[in-house]
Amino acid sequence: MRMKKILSVLAGLILFANTTFAEELSIEKQLVGIVGAINGTVKTETRTLKAGDKIYLNETIYASENSGTQILLLDQSTFTIGSESEVVMDTFIYDPETSDGKIVASVKQGSLKVISGLISKKNPDSLTVEVPEGTLGSRGTEFQTNVSKGKTDTLLIGPGKNNTL
């Protein structure tokens, strides 16, 4: 009787472990781009980044003092993250066959320079950057924003179809 109980508990544990392991394997991270260049120390919540590393949806990128990185997104947009910055890739939807999609990033602190890629060239309203004071739309152009102590400064660099934010 005791042996049956032990075997039942072991079978239950094995079944639970296999189910949990299978669930973990099915959770696939969504790739949004790669690190093209890096200077100094740039990290995510779980790793220190180097050139060629993949960037995934919902990752927070932290650039320390005197550091920065350039992220090349799958739609050919470029995000350059400056020193002492914190940027999150919130939304990335991209169909490479049609260039349809949507990109949303958040700048919590520091600087982000954006050069629009295929998604926002097709639909200028489809790339936005959230900052503490509101939302910036790229409108198919190039811009840089800096968030410091809750205040946001934004520079329109251009060129863009409408050259507006």
What positions do the PLM features span?
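Bacterial N-terminal signal peptides that target proteins for export
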Residues: M1-L7
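Intrinsically disordered, low-complexity segments enriched in glycine/proline and serine/threonine
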Residues: L7-S8, Y62
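Intrinsically disordered and other compositionally biased segments
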Residues: S8-V9, A22
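Bacterial N-terminal signal peptides
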Residues: V9-A17
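Flexible, surface-exposed loop/linker segments and immediately adjacent secondary-structure boundaries
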Residues: A22-S64, G68-T69, L73-L165
